[in-house]
Amino acid sequence: MSSEVDPILAPPNMAVFCDYENVAIGVRDAKYDAFDISLVLEQLLNKGKIVVKKAYADWDRYRPAKRPMHEAAFELIEIPHVSYSGKNSADIRMVVDALDLCYTKSHLEIFVIMSGDSDFSPLVSKLCENNKQVIGVG
């Protein structure tokens, strides 16, 4: 008997992309105490296996968040405030990274976009064209 998991029974692989600055602003504006990434990840694990986690922000401005995000095994992508050409720098980087993984990592079936922005409609359309499921959080 083989010890390999039947691919039909295996949970789908998932990639999570977090626009942390946008999420933090949403939490602040909603007057929540804090943002707890572990609660979000707990819910996402009901949908599949998380194999990629990337979070985008000017991490010097969000130092207290670095530790919990590291502990949750996120790759922290630095988007320096001085290089902002507008509020879309993190958005553009997220889109590029998501499409890169869409086209190069066929084992990824679910893409999670964590952001309060509605700017991601073209990305969602492109992911769906490539037979990917998309979950929006924010």
Protein language model regions, located:
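Domain-level signal for Mg2+-assisted phosphodiester chemistry and nucleotide/NA-binding surfaces
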Residues: M1-Y103, L123-I135
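Glycine-rich phosphate-binding loop signature in dinucleotide/nucleotide-binding domains
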Residues: T104-E109
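Non-catalytic, usually N-terminal nucleic-acid engagement modules in DNA/RNA processing proteins
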Residues: I113
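Short glycine-rich, flexible loops that bind phosphorylated cofactors or substrates
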Residues: F120
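Basic phosphate/pyrophosphate-binding loop/patch that engages nucleotide-derived ligands
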Residues: G138
